[in-house]
Amino acid sequence: MRQQQQQQQESRFKRTCVFCGSSQGNKTTYRDAAVDLAKELVARGIDLVYGGGSIGLMGLVSQAVYDGGRHVIGVIPKTLMTPEIIGETVGEVRPVSDMHQRKAEMARQSDAFIALPGGYGTLEELLEVITWAQLGIHHKPVGLLNVDGYYNSLLTFIDQAVEEGFISPSARRIIVSAPTAQELMDKLEEYVPYHDRVASGLNWETGHLGF
C-alpha cells in the first residue's frame, strides 16, 4: 500500500486515454495485458478516458479501472449509444455528436495516450494523435503496448518510412513502445517531446481540444 501511494504521488498524469479493440482478440495475452494496464493505471492513481462501452478490450480496461476505484470517462457518439452495439458503460458517459468530436473530446480530457492491440479504429485513433504531436498541436506522450509483438509490423513500417524519407528520424521518437504495462508507463512518465515539429511556426486554434 505504501508503494502504491508513492506511485500515485509521483505520476505526472491525471488521466490517460486508452485506445483498444472492441474485440478481445484471439489470445489470452491480449486480455491479460488490458487488465494489467488497468491495474497499472490504478496503482499510479490515474483515471481512464476511453471510447465507452463494455465489449472487447475496452470493456476489460474500463471495468478493471472502475473496480480499482478510479474515475472512468467513456466518450461515445450518440448514434452508438445502444446496449446492442457497445454494451453498458461504467463510470461517466459523455455523449458526443460524431466520431470526430469523440476523438477531440478524448484528447482534450487526457494527459497521455496508450494503444492496446486493436483494429482499424484503434489504428486511426493512434495515428491521428501521433500526427497531432508531429504538427505541434499537443505535446502529450503516445505509447504502444506491444503485446506479444502485435505492433512489430507497424513499427517496422514506420522505420521503413523513416529510411525512405517520409518520416523524419525525430518524428519517429514520438512513439513510445514497450511489451508490458509497467515498462510502458515508466517510459511515458519520463517522456520529453524533443522531436522537431513539422509546423512549429503555426498558431493552431486548439482551444476546443484543451491543448
Swiss-Prot record:
Keyword Oxidoreductase applies: no
Which InterPro entries does this UniProt record tie to the protein?
Answer: LOG, LOG_fam
Question: Where, if anywhere, are coiled coils annotated?
Answer: none
> What top-tier enzyme class does this entry carry?
hydrolase
Alphabetical GO biological process terms: cytokinin biosynthetic process
- Return the similarity comment: Belongs to the LOG family.
Q: What is this protein called?
A: Probable cytokinin riboside 5'-monophosphate phosphoribohydrolase LOGL3
Upper classification of the source organism reads: Eukaryota, Viridiplantae, Streptophyta, Embryophyta, Tracheophyta
